Amino acid sequence: MLTIKLGNMANSERERTADWFRRFASAEVAESPRYRDWALGIANDDQLLALVARLPLSKRQPVLVLTCARVAGVPLRSFETARDDFIALWPAIAKLAKTRATQTNDPRRCTPLLVALDRIRGPIALIEVGASAGLTLFPDRYTYTWNARGRSVTSLPADGPSTVSLVADIAGWGANPPRRPNIVHREGIDLSPLDVTKPSDRDWLEALVWPEQSDRLDIVRAAADIVAQSPPTLTAGDAVAEIRAAVARARKAAPNATIVVSSPAVLVYLDRAEREKFATYCARSKVRWISLDGRRVIPRIGDAADELGIEGDFVLSLDGVPIASTDPLGRQVTVHGGSGLSPEDVDFIEFERENWGPTRSKESLVRKVWNLPLVRYYQRLYGIMESPAARRYDPILVRSFAETSEL
């Protein structure tokens, strides 16, 4: 039977670990009720807290501990029912935690990535740090459905519909969906890259999907099948230490391509000095850098987002300039195009383009999409169309609108 003397661990370490698990439970309540229950159970259990706190600090991450528990065989039952399994299986849980890492590889993050890649022309050599299994190195291979106000657009790969279908609500986008990038070279960097052709790595990748997220699991499995058909180069190493060599390899492999470095939700795992070193390298090395991170992970990006009026906890930036807000998994994207129009202004213009002029169904459609009476809708639209920003955005449409209004 596994026993532990609680007096061997400082109270501060127990409290630190308990607080970490409580914060996780609070933040992730909507994503996984089971993990919330387990996290709170551990946070209030002195014996399990002592066991968790014996792990190296980086291995105490709640999602890592809970995933290892599942893989070790703890059944998906309430914490009260499963507690004895946690205790009995702890040696296996700890062994897994010491050899594995949280390598969440969610293809849905390709939706904001595509928004940024749309601004880069020509062939692309894509390098991703924190690539895990490389599922987000293939944004050109997936089907996308973009839902905007009053319209929906589906974009297919060149060879037809993909088995991976990603859906995102997008605001502030223009008339056409983001273009598909021409990716001619791919490389991922990760401390412990996963090979989806190996059953053990594939099992771990799937285990990182939380219990209730069956739709997400389907996406990960389908994306892994695509990656397995043409595995990218995945280099084991630290992001800051390996990025220079990866860029050099990309320049040699694709000399005519634009090198794009992507860091989707990974810089938060580096300390502040390493983040700054990485950002400085990207700024000085003649590469394009796409960042998708929490608002304050790179403080100057967060400050720039404040100045631009970009809201939200996650910010998409290109070369250090914020271009959109997004949720952490790319399910909602609000684009700020720099035209002087707000995202909602752009959506108004594009809605009118799609539903030009008075029609029999216009009034009901306006109420459904904008929750406005038709008169109020046109008042708002007139105000937008008369602005210099709208004339810069689409002078032909603005002129046509003005001519129609005079009739």
Where are these regions (language model features)?
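Class I SAM-dependent methyltransferase Rossmann-like catalytic core
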Residues: 37-123, 135-143
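Amphipathic, hydrophobic secondary-structure cores in small proteins
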Residues: 350-390
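Class I S-adenosyl-L-methionine-dependent methyltransferase module
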Residues: 55, 75, 100, 104, ...
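Short Lys/Arg-enriched helix C-cap and helix-to-coil transition segments
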Residues: 389-403
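Non-catalytic accessory regions outside enzyme or core folds
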Residues: 1-54
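A short SAM/SAH-binding and catalytic strip from SAM-dependent methyltransferases
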Residues: 259-272
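C-terminal substrate-binding/active-site "lid" region of AdoMet-derived donor-dependent transferases
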Residues: 269-318
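Short, Lys/Arg-enriched anionic-surface-contact patches
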Residues: 340-347
